[in-house]
């Protein structure tokens, strides 16, 4: 979606509709941090995003929550910024009632959910302490994780702790991170 710092996401709703209706898109990329690592946008659960979410629900399309590059030297884009954003998105969903307002809204968190699978017990405990729904109930029809984690042990952990109905196959574009497993 076309997003810029300080520009309301309602401006992206028309482009989402055009892409779905005219070009056959089946989802969109939602950048929770168009500032490039300075995090100036409201949380993903803030009403700031609601006009876009209304359009996503109307069109029945999910959003992949994925930041773009980092202009902040504290956060390497692929090694920190991406994974921080994945983890942050999950925590924002855990602490708010977004899915009560939008029961049909769907998000895909890439990179196996960032640190979420590794700290599933921490998030389960936080949900209990905060009197939130069980994690399995929280994500049931709304939050999905992909398998793009670059090595089999990471995929194994993801499949062990996250409900299987919430895991989608995902692979990376050629060349994002190169290595041999």
Model-derived regions, located:
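H/E-rich (His + Asp/Glu) clusters that bind or coordinate divalent metals
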Residues: 74-95, 102, 106-181
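Active-site gating/metal-coordination segments in enzymes
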Residues: 1-92
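A short acidic, amphipathic alpha-helical/loop segment
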Residues: 15, 52, 98, 156-158
């Amino acid at each position: 979606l076309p997003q810029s710092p300080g520009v309301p996401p309602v401006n992206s709703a028309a482009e989402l509709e055009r892409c779905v209706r005219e070009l056959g898109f089946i989802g969109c990329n939602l950048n929770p941090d168009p500032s490039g690592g300075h995090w100036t946008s409201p949380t993903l659960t803030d009403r700031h995003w609601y006009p876009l979410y209304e359009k996503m629900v109307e069109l029945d399309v999910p959003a992949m929550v994925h930041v773009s590059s980092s202009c902040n030297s504290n956060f390497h884009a692929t090694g920190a910024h991406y994974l921080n954003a994945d983890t942050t998105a999950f925590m924002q969903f855990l602490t708010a009632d977004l899915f009560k307002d939008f029961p049909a809204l769907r998000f895909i968190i890439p990179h196996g959910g960032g640190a979420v699978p590794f700290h599933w017990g921490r998030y389960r405990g936080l949900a209990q302490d905060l009197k939130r729904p069980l994690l399995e109930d929280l994500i049931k029809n709304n939050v999905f994780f992909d398998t793009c984690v670059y090595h089999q042990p990471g995929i194994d952990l993801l499949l062990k702790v996250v409900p299987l109905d919430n895991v989608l196959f995902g692979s990376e574009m050629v060349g994002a991170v190169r290595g041999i497993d």
